[in-house]
Amino acid sequence: MFEYKCKLVKVVDGDTVDVDIDLGFGVWLQNQRIRLYGIDTPESRTSDAEEKKYGLAAKERMQEWLDGGNLKIVTHKDAKGKYGRILGELYTFDTNINDKMVEECHAVGYHGQSKEEIAEEHLLNRKNVVI
């Protein structure tokens, strides 16, 4: 695993962000897409109005967490996921944002299962999310 300071460019959705990564010595990787490792949030770009509502709530919560700056990304395997995104855990100060999204029921644990396998968990989360 590798650890880098980074600056938020934009929140794409509840489990994906774009950041500029500080490699040190004044070297930066600009506008890198990060997929938050080990979590899945409802889709914010979908024709399912109910899922979209919860997906947008997850995106909004992610934005609230990251507005403070002082971000750090801990990458996993220094590799990219199936859609070409860097996989990592995002921290603000010492708070693991991946874990907080699950704790607050905006996300479920995800380790390669199919969408069908985690659909029930997403439905259960809807009962606990304040929108």
Show the residue positions of the predicted features.
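Small beta-barrel nucleic-acid-binding modules, primarily SNase/OB-fold domains
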Residues: 1-131
